[in-house]
Amino acid sequence: MMFLRIIQDIALMSSVGVVLAFVMVIAQRWLSNYGELTININSKKDLTVTGGSSLLSSLGEKQIFIPSACGGRGSCGACKCKVNEGGGPLLPTEKPYLSKSEIESNVRLACQVKVKSDIKIEIPDSIFNIRRFHSEIVEIIDYTYDIKGITFKLLNGETIDFKAGQYVQLETQPYAKVKQSVMRAYSISSKPEINDSIQLIIRLVPEGICTTWVHNHLKQGDKVNFTGPYGDFYLRDTDADILFVAGGSGKAPIKSMLEHLKVVGTQRKMSYFFGARTTKDLYLTEEMQSYEKHFQDFHYIPVLSHPEADDNWEGRTGFVMPYFKEAIRDPKNTEAYLCGSPGMIAGVTKSLVEDYGLSADKIYYDSFG
């Protein structure tokens, strides 16, 4: 009898557990069903969206693309916009990317804000110029053991207008164990005067979802979508001397700028410091040397931090900063364009301001990592 009673109790508890689980599923579905909601943009435009998704993805579904270098993972802080009503409380995941003044001005990260009620936001008008493009891969070049150059030919008569230095967000396709598409940001390396195709330079990042797809799965003839152009890192139209500093795939936007300057026939004094570990990490050297012949006053200076014995390297070594003294003629008439890791950007910026007297507002950079 006791054994039978135990069996009955277990059956009863199991039934209760099933009922509770069912109720929780129904409740979760009911609570997460926010229905149709309105996103008001700049007090001018209303969008009707299905609630429950992030503000970033909700806008993307309506072909409004806010910059997001990390693809909405909350790790880049690029998708900032003002949320004046309906955004809910500021999340701990947002605070590291927002200054005190930004928080006081209702700035939020669009990827962290969930659309759970009608919401009012402010975004720059330039965002409306960002589009989704369709392309075909027409060329893949191995620049080094871990860097490729890829050419995307636009389809359906599409053209793209961008400034030298800007970037696009590449949409991956599912592959292997990666079942969903992701978006990652890459700088355009081609000149803006060619508007029916773009070139990107992409370095393989270990276990990187997008770079693994590009290096191991992407092939000529594949169809690929991307959005853009994005970014405030672009060449300023002045007569100031230029100091370029980059490393690795950071050569991409600098190459775009140099190609553009070649087209317009600039007379500006330019120096380009390219940081690498060994000679295996140097690429497009002949093209850089061709710029030295083309421009009236351009110098390409590669600097190796860890040259190997068999490199037979006779050039500059160590950090790039000590060599800036060769290039900076007039700090008050010099602009710097930096592209590389956050650590490199911070170190170079500090040196330019403290050691060489450049104004911080004349230092432009594209930080990735």
Model regions and ranges:
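Residue-level marker of beta-strand positions
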Residues: 78, 120, 167, 222-223
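Reductase modules of NAD(P)H-dependent flavoproteins
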Residues: 2-72, 83-105, 273-369
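Ferredoxin-reductase
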Residues: 132-222, 276-278, 303-306
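Short cysteine clusters
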Residues: 70, 76-79, 111
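A short, basic/flexible loop-to-alpha-helix module at the beginning of a structural domain
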Residues: 227-240
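Short, conserved phosphate/pyrophosphate- and ester-handling motifs at nucleotide-, phospho-/glycolipid
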Residues: 165, 250, 341
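Fe-S ferredoxin-like electron-transfer domains
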Residues: 19-26, 30, 96-153, 158
